[in-house]
Amino acid sequence: RNDLYAGYKDGAGMEEAILLQIPVMEDALTAAGFTVWPMVTHEADDALGAAAAVADADERVEQVLIVTPDKDLGQCVRGDRVVQFDRRKREILDEEGIIAKFGVGPRSIPDYLGLVGDSADGFPGLPGWGAKSASAVLAVYGHLEDIPPAAGQWEVPGLRGAAKLSATLQSQLELAVLFRRIATLDRILGGRLTVNIISSD
């Protein structure tokens, strides 16, 4: 993701003393019985998404709880089987909860973030596109490529500024697609994961 977009978050600014503690922390967690997955080309969110997908596919697992408030993890939610938990707000979001919060379903979350951006990950989205406009348009069309090129073709009731939004999208569609790619989690991770691997029991 850093190679795709220069503004994407990185470890810059992290004190060297903290960086030096990471291997020590990994060893301590492993010794305590926790599963540790050191990664170079992937991030923690990819690992969470991959683990959730593996657990979802295992019939022995009753429910998958993804414990993070990060917006991009919303794409992993499925029905009430794979849910997202924000422990600060004590809020559990199933698929209906994701729709209520963002105005779009889990499959459209990367497209949504491609339009509005994600400040936590360091990409801005498109100018003029906010949460309301993105959710209104994507609730109808689902994905960036399915949005008609001309605002006159849009069937989005009550949307203001459609012409300007459409012009911005058409002129910066490649950028929106790039941001969507950044927001899309790798939930396969080379097929290396199993429930037995991700379990600390």
Where are the regions that the model predicts?
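Non-catalytic nucleic-acid-binding/docking modules located in mid-to-C-terminal regions
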Residues: 14, 34-35, 60, 89-201
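Noncatalytic, basic helical substrate-engagement surface that gates or grips nucleic-acid strands
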Residues: 1-67, 72-83, 87-92, 175-178, ...
